[in-house]
A protein has these predicted regions:
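Structural signature of eukaryotic scaffold interfaces centered on beta-propeller domains
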Residues: 165-181, 221-224, 263-272, 311-326, ...
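Asp-box/WD-like beta-propeller blade repeats and closely related beta-sheet repeat scaffolds
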Residues: 255-329, 333-336, 349-357, 362
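Sequence/structural segment immediately N-terminal to covalent heme-attachment motifs in c-type
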Residues: 68-89, 111-118
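Short loop/turn segments immediately following beta-strands, especially the blade-tip
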Residues: 241-246, 289-297, 344-348, 389-393, ...
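A short beta-strand motif characteristic of beta-propeller blades
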Residues: 206-211, 247-254, 295-300, 304-311, ...
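Electrostatic cytochrome c docking/interface patches
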Residues: 36-78, 172-175
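Extracytoplasmic electron-transfer domains, predominantly the class I c-type cytochrome c fold
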Residues: 28-46, 90, 94, 100-151
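Loop/turn-rich, solvent-exposed surfaces of beta-rich toroidal or solenoidal domains
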Residues: 418-423, 429-431, 456-540
Length: 580
């Protein structure tokens, strides 16, 4: 007994000392404090999940510390709001480490409390010392991760059809355009926290309509004809908006899961506007739908083996999806398994899928200028995968900077190296330029031909236009307000020149103390204006700033009380034709 008491005393002293030691290293949540893990990465990875509001069953584990039903429910909500993005829905690990009970029970409550409170050099946020969690919440989470992970409900055809609504049947819709808007130059702007998109006339800068959608719309996509606008919220709700109506508005909607990010529509000749596809984070699957009603037709699971270790993964999330222009295929990128699926929709009853092994943690990407090659960031692998959609094979895996996040990227002709595609990064200040012409510039193809140095990490989107001589790079997740509130502009005719900084948030003229993060440059159809969202919290003022691309001067500011948390925006023509 004395020996046992001595060991317990030694363990207690060690645990008591650990917070002090870790706290010294990590209390200041800076890039240096986490050995290269930037605040931008933490902000990006620790995002909330709509699964926080879903009811789930509590399995009692007799080996775990006790929790009441109320405590379990509260902890589950915290987990899905702050932790699931890194550690996975089932706690099997995603971009973060697994938190399964075979690991957490061995660690014990006291160890886990220290780990949660003070973080880790690998990138775990210091939840308590940063003020994000109270000591009581840290104790709650330390006990929660020792319980069996609750499983969210599946979402099959029955559940989808229960949410499917055709608000205006196709036969009752206009047979011609019933408004005077220049549809090609309409912008669909996400109003993140209000669950809406603003349709804005790019010619007059007036709001056409505020359309109710799912929560935190991730992207807007256009049908091949340019008539229908598809938007998908993080809560997996898709809205179909008819731009031909006198006042463009919803004509159909559906939920395709519990959490999602991606939607697109068929573009191949003979299949224009016929099908839509959407992929979900949970359940891990994609669904093919009727293009003008959103009727669900076929659901395909993405659960399977990882591309590297060939281990089974129970929740590989569907990230970006794009439609090829010259044949009936969707390119579906599966995050955790690292697989790129070429889904041939010419006969969905006998579906043919080509599986291409790439790299784990696939996320977003875009076409090269020829629209033959699709480039997609494998963000936590620090790579860009290149798919040859003509030959249906992987063309290359390109090593880039830390956590590439291109949005759709940017295409332009480099003065020395020919056609390139560019991506910014969340984890560092670099902008990678990748050669994309294997025929006329073979030596530069699928290599980083130049790294530009931007303002800093925390970049989400990068953009240019065939008629522009500038490249715009945002940094909304950078911890330095001067950087997050401005954009870097590179001269494409002289890439050795230092970038120019445009003080977009300052130009917006917002008087309150909102964050004023500047996000997602987007050109108008003509390619002579660039739009930026100045994004603050929903109880603060936000705005859209329009810049003259030729002069790099302020052109106009769009302000309206209805512009609540504007983030991404998508010009109809450029989105329809994949111009970026």
């Amino acid at each position: 007994m004395p020996q046992i008491r001595l060991k317990l005393k030694q363990a207690t002293i060690a645990l008591a000392a650990l917070p002090f030691a870790v706290g010294i290293a990590l209390a200041k949540d800076t890039p240096e404090a986490k050995k290269g893990v930037t605040e931008a990465e933490v902000k990006y990875q620790a995002g909330g999940s709509p699964l926080a509001g879903e009811p789930m069953h509590q399995n009692i584990n007799p080996k775990a510390p006790p929790m009441t039903a109320a405590e379990f429910s509260k902890a589950r909500q915290i987990y899905f709001e702050r932790c699931a993005g890194c550690h996975g829905v089932l706690r099997k690990g995603a971009t973060g480490k697994p938190l399964t009970t075979d690991i957490t029970l061995d660690k014990g409550t006291e160890y886990l409390k220290v780990f949660i409170a003070y973080g880790s050099p690998a990138g775990m946020p210091n939840w308590q010392t940063s003020g994000e969690m109270t000591a009581e919440e840290v104790d709650l989470m330390a006990r929660y991760v020792q319980q069996e992970p609750p499983t969210p409900p599946e979402f099959g055809m029955k559940e989808m059809k229960a949410t499917w609504k055709v608000l205006v049947p196709p036969e009752k819709r206009p047979t011609k355009k019933m408004n005077n808007y220049n549809i090609d130059n309409i912008f669909s702007t996400t109003l993140r926290d209000s669950g809406e998109v603003a349709l804005i006339d790019g010619d007059t800068k007036q709001i056409i309509n505020i359309v109710k959608t799912g929560y935190a719309v991730h992207i807007s996509r256009l049908s091949a004809s340019g008539r229908y606008l598809f938007v998908i919220g993080r809560d997996a709700r898709i809205n179909l908006i008819d731009l031909w109506m006198e006042k463009p508005d919803n004509v159909a909607e559906i939920k395709i899961g519990l959490e999602a990010r991606s939607v697109d529509t068929s573009k191949a000749k003979g299949f224009e506007d016929k099908y839509a596809i959407a992929g979900s984070y949970w359940p891990p699957q994609y669904v093919l739908m009727n293009g003008d009603t959103l009727e669900p037709l076929k659901i395909v699971s993405t659960r399977g083996m990882t591309v590297d270790t060939q281990d089974y993964h129970p929740e590989p999330r569907v990230a970006s999806i794009v439609a090829t222009h010259d044949k009936p295929e969707f390119v579906v990128n599966v995050k955790e398994t690292g697989k790129i699926l070429l889904v041939n929709y010419s006969d969905i009853d006998n579906l043919k899928v080509t599986e291409i092994g790439a790299a784990r943690f696939l996320h977003d990407g875009g076409w090269d200028s020829s629209k033959r090659y699709f480039l997609v960031a494998a963000n936590q692998s620090n790579k860009v995968a290149v798919v040859d959609t003509k030959d249906s094979k992987l063309a290359a895996l390109v090593d880039v900077g830390k956590i590439p996040h291109p949005g759709r990227g940017a295409n332009f002709v480099h003065p020395k190296f020919g056609p390139v595609w560019a991506t910014g990064h969340l984890g560092d200040e670099s902008v990678a330029l990748i050669g994309t012409d294997p025929e006329k510039h073979k030596d530069q193809a699928w290599k980083v031909v130049q790294n530009l140095k931007g303002q800093g990490g925390g970049s989400l989107f990068i953009k240019t236009h065939p008629k522009s001589k500038y490249l715009y790079v945002d940094t909304p997740l950078n911890p330095d307000a001067k950087i997050s509130q401005s954009v870097a502009v590179f001269d494409l005719e002289n890439l050795d020149k230092p970038y120019q900084v445009l003080p977009i948030a300052e130009w917006a003229g917002l008087s309150d103390d909102g964050a004023k993060r500047v996000v997602q440059p987007e050109f108008n159809k003509a390619g002579d204006e660039v739009w930026f969202s100045v994004w603050s919290a929903k109880d603060k003022e936000s705005a859209i700033v329009v810049v003259d691309d030729k002069t790099l001067k302020l052109k106009t500011v769009i302000k309206d009380p209805k512009l609540i948390t504007p983030t991404g925006h998508f010009n109809v023509y450029n989105t329809q034709h994949d111009i970026y």
